[in-house]
């Protein structure tokens, strides 16, 4: 989204967070659970005290995955990836709005950080949904994929979730493919 954690958008601090995919850039399986100091202290003790929370998984402590995770965190500290993503997020949303906001089958465009959602509707004024059996979101997903763009269809809402390092030129190209794919499918109904 352009923030280190999605909860940062809501200005909340959870007591427990589970992290995985982004830790290794998605290349190796690893995950971790992060807690407040108070929760950590409640379970930290010598084994004999019987209050330790003992758990593990087959992929825990893999040296290669841990090394990759540390390097990803170093890169996020050293390079302005999140700052650039935050700077580019409004630009991307504006591109999508300019291209699709007035299109008669787009009922809403919403965003948080770099993630944008494009809602397809049968009637723009009433926001009437399409019958789910048509699967227009999925049809648009397949059309865009053939053109080199990966969208995420959840029903008739298309999620545009680009990489944090996407350039503005790549954004322009991706938004054009997205808009062309939407029009190609929807103009044929």
Role assignments for model-derived ranges:
Residues 1-189:
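Conserved N-terminal phosphate-binding loop of PLP-dependent enzymes in the Aspartate aminotransferase
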